[in-house]
Amino acid sequence: MSPIWSNWPGEQVCAPSAIVRPTSEAELADVIAQAAKRGERVRAVGSGHSFTDIACTDGVMIDMTGLQRVLDVDQPTGLVTVEGGAKLRALGPQLAQRRLGLENQGDVDPQSITGATATATHGTGVRFQNLSARIVSLRLVTAGGEVLSLSEGDDYLAARVSLGALGVISQVTLQTVPLFTLHRHDQRRSLAQTLERLDEFVDGNDHFEFFVFPYADKALTRTMHRSDEQPKPTPGWQRMVGENFENGGLSLICQTGRRFPSVAPRLNRLMTNMMSSSTVQDRAYKVFATQRKVRFTEMEYAIPRENGREALQRVIDLVRRRSLPIMFPIEVRFSAPDDSFLSTAYGRDTCYIAVHQYAGMEFESYFRAVEEIMDDYAGRPHWGKRHYQTAATLRERYPQWDRFAAVRDRLDPDRVFLNDYTRRVLGP
């Protein structure tokens, strides 16, 4: 009987022929080579934190949780080598012990390092690139069990954001930075003021993002500044109370909205009124990531920064015009361009607009309508979140698409690492 695997929200389910948990690079290479000889396909999985079926397979699934060690730390240069299954949540404190930290992070941290980088996971901050751009070298196990060390050239630029389509990354060497403190201030503002002053907020802060419930006229802005000051940690009990209140309040409101969709506008305004100002000063890895306990599904698009304000307003107008029962806020973030071939921020200053829906509520009509808006801006969907694009629609949005395809054809000509998702978004 085949094992059953599901992703973290339980929305993607598959039955691999086997789930294998290697604990060394040599074992990983052998598992891949043997599967390829049998004619089986292979996919690697870390935390299963993607909303798409990117990890699913009916072939051999490689569980990367046996490869989580920190292998080398060069404190003077900040170069840190970790195994491909290392979890961001564990890496933060491990680096902090050595007075180092990741330059930037997303707003959740259960992902594995290679799962996060393979999908171009990002944080916010217009002067900072996504996480994959911090990879200075990597080791890639190909379909034949060969281990490639990559630090330059097309293979390297393709492998940093690869969707797992080139092989399995056994190790990455990251460029880290000296340990720093992050000062975060959350403040409720009018949506009109937030949009009017958007460039000021984005350019005037190290990191800036904001959240808006589509039926409300307020936004929650989050500004963050870096420093070498000592942290002033929030007491554990106070942090726990705040997280439980925030997650519990959102959960209760979402459950009410799922049962009575027509009251979504009033619930949006209620949730907005519950948002309050707060300040945190702590080590960056404790501040970047927040606890998300309410189940949801998500789609996120990367568009040129200059189109962000207009695109957001169109999404809000869409929700209001169609009276859609949306219970989660829209999240807006920003990042610097980078040069990974399939990075969603390739070659342009980027605004990310993420839309969500509470688990168990209809989302497809909302997501498809938002996607149509993002198409007008050559939007690039987050590789690990829901979308409806195909290779045919995506190709023109990535200037280096053909260079990635050439690397894929050379490294995996027999498509050992193919699954339904990569077939759809990259082609057969």
Curated annotation (Swiss-Prot):
GO cellular component: peptidoglycan-based cell wall; plasma membrane
Family: Belongs to the oxygen-dependent FAD-linked oxidoreductase family.
Associated pathway: Cofactor biosynthesis; L-ascorbate biosynthesis
EC annotation from Swiss-Prot or TrEMBL: 1.1.2.-
Cofactor requirements of the protein: a divalent metal cation
Coiled-coil boundaries: none
EC class: oxidoreductase
Note describing how the cofactor binds: Divalent metal cation.
Domain FAD-binding PCMH-type: 12-179
Species of provenance: Mycobacterium tuberculosis (strain ATCC 25618 / H37Rv)
pH dependence: Optimum pH is 8.0.
GO biological process, alphabetically ordered: L-ascorbic acid biosynthetic process
Catalysed conversion reaction: L-gulono-1,4-lactone + 2 Fe(III)-[cytochrome c] = L-ascorbate + 2 Fe(II)-[cytochrome c] + 3 H(+)
Regulation: Is completely inhibited by EDTA, N-ethylmaleimide, Cu(2+), Zn(2+), and potassium cyanide in vitro. Mg(2+) and Ca(2+) have no effect on the dehydrogenase activity, and 1 mm Mn(2+) slightly inhibit the enzyme (21% inhibition).
Any one GO molecular-function label of the UniProt entry: L-gulono-1,4-lactone dehydrogenase activity
Entry keyword set: Ascorbate biosynthesis, Oxidoreductase
Temperature remarks: Optimum temperature is 39 degrees Celsius. Is relatively thermostable since preincubation at 60 degrees Celsius for 5 minutes results in only partial inactivation of the enzyme (53% of control).
Function: Oxidizes L-gulono-1,4-lactone to L-xylo-hexulonolactone which spontaneously isomerizes to L-ascorbate. Can use both cytochrome c and phenazine methosulfate as exogenous electron acceptors, but molecular oxygen does not serve as a substrate. Is very specific for the L-gulono-1,4-lactone substrate, since it cannot oxidize L-galactono-1,4-lactone, D-glucurono-3,6-lactone, D-glucuronate, D-arabinose, or D-xylose.
Domain of life: Bacteria
Protein name per its UniProtKB record: L-gulono-1,4-lactone dehydrogenase
